Amino acid sequence: MTSVRKKNLTTLGYVTIANKHEFSTGKNGFQISPRMQELMVFAGQMDCYANCHEVIDQYLDVQVSSAQIHRVTDVYGEEVGKTVNEHNILTPPTKQEALYIEADGSMLLTREEGWKEVKLGRIFKASDCIHAGEKAGWISNSQYVAHLGGHKKFTLQMEQLIDNYSHKFSKLVFITHGAPWLKNWIEDAYPGSVSILDYYHASEYLHAFAREHFKAETLKTKWIEEQEKLLMEGMVRTVVKNVRDLQSTKKEATKLIEYFEANQERMKYNEYRKIGCGIFGSGAIESAHRKVIQKRMKQSGQRWSKAGAQNMLNLRVTKCNGSWERIVALTKTEFRKAA
């Protein structure tokens, strides 16, 4: 009598195996080999599902559908999300140095509620800031956190990592924009830290006011340059006085004055240059948005279910944190049975 046989999708294509074989039950609910599952998840988190199945076809000469990759990727994204923020990945400091924390939001289009904000955090050491001559600097190693939804869960996730790191570093340095929830969180949770208002975000208020107030381009440019120099030296009150002296009735003048007065304790840029690696701008978190979120999740026409978006964020964070071995480990466990 002929034994029942099953087909498993592998990196060599479909392989028929006996029903009694240990692999016949599949892995995590899929009749797909562990290595093939890993490659499908890797491809799925790198590019849209409509494209990544072509990559697998080209590299392995194995045909898989975009729907297959979607299902496998989503399952692993949900599972790795249970522990994605539990491990510190930064190497210990070689000396007493500053730990930098940046956070910001990015809008993502969801099916259920339209545009929703993804909170993104980036943590890195001062010694990981690399400067090569006059070239733009870069950060050699970072840990990311990404959450779709409210700020309370996001800040708890950030605190879990920061608290594990904080005792090893001489100083915590937060660089953020002026959102009240960020400012209040830092003041409440880390009162002894250095809290910096992103310089470039602050300078945007100068530009917005100058565009409304000055008609002549040369006057506008000259005025902005003068105020930015003062801002760089931490002379916030002087900048505010200069705006008041113009006696502008434009709404941007009021917005600038109120914003600068509310955040002046976080605008001591002349002092911040002497701390750690001397950065006080949001370049690190801006590039993190592009790397972690935009590259994969904000392509033309994309809309996400909220659950699917968080699952993908979990995978993007795992990949960008350099922790892909955690996905490999999951392919070797049995965390999910077939339906």
What are these regions (language model features)?
Residues 1-7:
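An N-terminal, globular interaction/scaffold subdomain
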Residues 8-339:
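Catalytic center-proximal scaffold of phosphoryl-transfer enzymes
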